[in-house]
Amino acid sequence: MENVGKKFLPVTAAVTGLGTAAVKTAADFDSEMSKVSAISGATGDDFDQLRAKAREMGAKTKFSASEAASAMEYMAMAGWKTSDMLNGIEGVMNLAAASGEDLATTSDIVTDALTAFGLSAADSGHFADILAAASSNANTNVSM
């Protein structure tokens, strides 16, 4: 019986490791979403919508839900409201994916630039497309 236990030890360790990683991933996501809530003031239904959108983006893009939440944090710091974040996150994520840049950094760049140009969150998708084209055509990257 002792031999059987020794044979299962690597399997048990692997399963425990997966469980630990899943708990950490969930905790990271919750931590990021708490920051979004604190900065944006989103509660109740607004917060639930943001949380669902971050999870959706994590499921359908190369980025995780935690990374999407981190991008929303920068949007919240820029004063974006819930509807702005819900509508703007896809354009920012597409730009980050196309450019290979970090998602949170890309969100920071887009929100800062929109503010500097006096544009609104509604312009984020178009603005992200322009940045992607400019960086591609100018042999540079989005952060330069």
State the predicted function of each range.
Residues 61-64:
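N-terminal glycine-rich anion-binding loops that anchor highly charged ligand groups
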